Amino acid sequence: MEQQSLKVVIVGGSIAGLTLAHCLHRANIDHVVLEKRAEIAPQEGASIGIWPNGARMLEQLGLYGELEKLTEPLNLMHIAFPDGFSFEDLLPTTINQRFGYPIIFLDRQKFLETLYRKYPDKSKIVTNTRVAEVQSSEKCARVITEDGTMYEGDIVVGADGVHSLVRREMWKLGDSKQPGSVPSREKTGMTVEYSCVYGISSPIVGLRAGESVNSYMDGMTVLTFHGKGGRVYWFLIQKLHQKYTYPNTPRYTVEDAERLCTDHRDTTIWKDIRIGHLWDNREVVSMTALEENLFAKWHFHRIGLMGDSIHKMTPNIGQGANSAIEDAAVFSSLLVHMMTSEGPGRPSSARIQRLLHDYQACRYERAEMIYHRSRFGARFQSRDDAVKLIVGRYVVPRIRNRLANISSMLIANGEIIQYLPFPKRSGPGWEKFRNKGEWMPYTPFALFSAILLVQHVVPLLGLTSPLLLAS
């Protein structure tokens, strides 16, 4: 593809930023990545789950094969409850068969290392560079760093995470150039109701590689994923006693993580596996507040946002990183389409603004669905109320064969990099489950739960109902 006279300045060198850099490189679009940290891939205890909707795009970029070598594909999941009952589900195997890609987990550090190592022009990734200001005019956009260096381009993309400086600068510019363009609720919309201890542990007897455990408790969820060599990636998610509004949210230390895990070390996760086993075998661990929000405004003038800076969700359904990859795919696809359809030369400010508008329009509905699915998942898995407790314990085990269908609809409607060849690796699920609806959250949960309770729980109690009699 012929080089075009356009440049993108990407702020943030994590999942969204590095994926976008790969996308732009493949399209011969000039760009630079500015990362505030001294190294691209620090080890902080985080892991990343790649589902088929993310894997397919990474395959297009020539990255997936390297990542897959580092993992053990999931094939079985166990769902456990505090009363000792548990059941197993072949959802991971079914997903692999349907889409041609397994669900995989690996160190976030290894994921970022791979993206960085496979990127061909390291001079375009500038580390140890903190952004101080973002400017946008009719002619260009500028990023000014704390040391006074200026980076100029046609578009600035904020891929700098939940605490995004680019988002704050975008708000400031919006308030200055077009008062009222940034709704006041945008600045107070992000909240915290859960904390999360996340870690990586050495192998634990009883936790088999290629399997996972979802342990649903009252006010707490423990998720474990067992990767290559039995390496255990885990999350301990706890409901907080109050709701916090960003930026006035809790900050946690490793000592806080130790205190929480020590208090619950004898809590059973599954069979004879306890929280203490995760803690005692830990290699690295961290604790954080889990911010949640779907921002309504993703762009202003020549500035656009992606990843956690616009849709921050809990890790319960494992789609945060995959959603960031989808953002990069859609943004770069629209950019390539704009440049090929309009010919060489720098696009006008108005054209850039239309591009960013189209980007949000293409992504928002799906991002909203995934955000609400994640939000629901956090509350469902922690048994947030009596209905969720009953449905989780007594209904879900009876409809386990449908769980893969719910996930399949989410996967099949995933994005793709439009200007790169579709992967040969595939499966029947992409076509079968595409545009089949997204189940939740558009069915009101109260109604959905009532139907499930009547259909599945009432018979267990030896009762009858008009709905059952009618069926």
Curated annotation (Swiss-Prot):
Sections of the chain in a coiled coil: none
GO cellular component: membrane
EC number per UniProt: 1.-.-.-
Keywords carried by this UniProt record: FAD, Flavoprotein, Membrane, Oxidoreductase, Transmembrane, Transmembrane helix
Transmembrane regions listed in the UniProt entry: 403-423, 443-463
GO BP, sorted A to Z: terpenoid biosynthetic process
Active-site residue list: 216
Cofactor: FAD
Broadest EC class assigned to this enzyme: oxidoreductase
Binding site for FAD: 35, 49, 108, 308, 321
MF terms in GO: FAD binding; monooxygenase activity
Predominant place of localization: membrane
Pfam families on file: FAD_binding_3
UniProt key word RNA-binding: no
Superkingdom of source: Eukaryota
InterPro entries: FAD-bd (IPR002938), FAD/NAD-bd_sf (IPR036188), FAD_mOase_fung (IPR050562)
Biological or metabolic pathway of the protein: Secondary metabolite biosynthesis; terpenoid biosynthesis
Annotated membrane topology: Multi-pass membrane protein
Subcellular compartments: Membrane
Family, per entry: Belongs to the paxM FAD-dependent monooxygenase family.
Reported function: FAD-dependent monooxygenase; part of the gene cluster that mediates the biosynthesis of anditomin, a fungal meroterpenoid. The first step of the pathway is the synthesis of 3,5-dimethylorsellinic acid (DMOA) by the polyketide synthase andM. DMOA is then converted to the phthalide compound 5,7-dihydroxy-4,6-dimethylphthalide (DHDMP) by the cytochrome P450 monooxygenase andK, which is further prenylated by the prenyltransferase andD to yield farnesyl-DHDMP. Further epoxidation by the FAD-dependent monooxygenase andE leads to epoxyfarnesyl-DHDMP.
The protein's name in its UniProt record: FAD-dependent monooxygenase andE
Source organism per UniProt: Emericella variicolor
Organism phylogeny: Eukaryota, Fungi, Dikarya, Ascomycota, Pezizomycotina
UniProt gene name: andE
